[in-house]
Amino acid sequence: VATDMEIWQGHPGKVLGVREDWANRYPNTHVALVKALLEAGRYCADTKNHQEIREILASRNYLATKEEYIQLGEPSNYSCNLDKHVEYAHHMFFGDGLNRPSRTEHLWMMTQMARWGHIPFPRNWVEILERVCRVGTFSTASRELELGDLKYRRSPIQLFDDVAFDAEDPIGYLNHLGIERNFTIAEVHLASPTFVAA
């Protein structure tokens, strides 16, 4: 048995998704939503707040469980095997490079969907990434919170199979996988974005 962190260290945990027409119609609300999530992440990352968070999550309104079952940031030492215990950084709520949208990760997910036959790999993948993964909204929110413009440090994604994903060559990545299927490449036609004048 492997944990998700053993398969992909630092993988994205959650994704905020909104409809494009909503984001275009309510850009200020979109930025405010991202700011609220960043502030909540910063609050959750502060160990001074962990007891309060455990109490809230353990309450009947949420998980209805015992507080001691809820771990924030400090992995349990309980283990089911005799191997040396490895601790991974879990529940990373806030920090340098966290929470920033990653077009590299989005692109990797597109390659996986194409790899397993769920979608054709989009020939116009750059256009799709620019429409789907709007880094500008995050950058605006982080600047307004005076976090600075958090830069994404792009590095290859490497999973347990030791095949590095290079975002510069997604087709080459698909063609060099040990476990592979035939995949198709097709132009994905996107509707024109709708912008609302302020």
Locations of the language-model features?
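A bilobed periplasmic-binding-protein/Venus flytrap-type ligand-binding module shared by bacterial periplasmic
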Residues: 12-29, 43
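Secondary-structure end/capping motifs
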Residues: 26-132
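Generic structural hydrophobic/aromatic packing signal, biased to beta-strands
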Residues: 1, 16-19, 57, 113
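Flexible, active-site-adjacent loop/turn segments at secondary-structure boundaries
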Residues: 6, 20-21, 91
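Helix N-cap / beta->alpha transition motif
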Residues: 3, 19, 102, 130-138
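Conserved C-terminal helix/tail region of periplasmic/extracytoplasmic solute-binding proteins
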Residues: 107-198
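Short beta-strand->loop
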Residues: 1-11
